[in-house]
From Swiss-Prot:
Disulfide bonds join C21-C69, C35-C84, C38-C122, C46-C100, C50-C102, C105-C112. CDD domains: GHB_like. This is Follitropin subunit beta. Belongs to the glycoprotein hormones subunit beta family. Glycans are attached at N25, N42. Transmembrane segments: none annotated. Keywords: Disease variant, Disulfide bond, Glycoprotein, Hormone, Hypogonadotropic hypogonadism, Pharmaceutical, Secreted, Signal. PROSITE patterns: GLYCO_HORMONE_BETA_1, GLYCO_HORMONE_BETA_2. Pfam families: Cys_knot. Residues 1-18 form the signal peptide. Heterodimer. The active follitropin is a heterodimer composed of an alpha chain/CGA shared with other hormones and a unique beta chain/FSHB shown here. It is linked to Hypogonadotropic hypogonadism 24 with or without anosmia: A form of hypogonadotropic hypogonadism, a group of disorders characterized by absent or incomplete sexual maturation by the age of 18 years, in conjunction with low levels of circulating gonadotropins and testosterone and no other abnormalities of the hypothalamic-pituitary axis. HH24 is characterized by primary amenorrhea in women, oligo or azoospermia with low to normal testosterone levels in men, and infertility.
Length: 129
């Protein structure tokens, strides 16, 4: 019985501590309409699991906030997109997460949908590295 209890506690600890919300490296596709192609860049963003629960009984007095792994702090970096027309603005600014936490998704600055386009989506056919 003690082995079963230890195993249960170990699984809880692993779920909470080991799969936490943390910075991770990702590759995103960036595009400028004036340039008509995409390039991929490496950046950091937040990924992982946050403890959350969904009650069976919906209490109107309790806020309905599901915590998600999101950025706590971020900076912006700028890259020049090659191959743009001379009159076009070839600079593209993108966010880089520097610190993560489990919190409410801010829909003013983040795509909080279940099925977003994804970081590698490119609306143009040509992708350059």
């Amino acid at each position: 019985m003690k082995t079963l209890q230890f195993f249960f506690l170990f699984c809880c600890w692993k779920a909470i501590c080991c799969n936490s919300c943390e910075l991770t490296n990702i590759t995103i596709a960036i595009e400028k309409e004036e340039c008509r192609f995409c390039i991929s860049i490496n950046t950091t963003w937040c990924a992982g699991y946050c403890y959350t629960r969904d009650l069976v009984y919906k209490d109107p007095a309790r806020p309905k906030i599901q915590k998600t792994c999101t950025f706590k702090e971020l900076v912006y970096e700028t890259v020049r997109v090659p191959g743009c027309a001379h009159h076009a603005d070839s600079l593209y600014t993108y966010p880089v997460a520097t610190q993560c936490h489990c919190g409410k998704c801010d829909s003013d600055s983040t795509d909080c949908t279940v099925r977003g386009l994804g970081p590698s989506y490119c609306s143009f056919g040509e992708m350059k590295e």
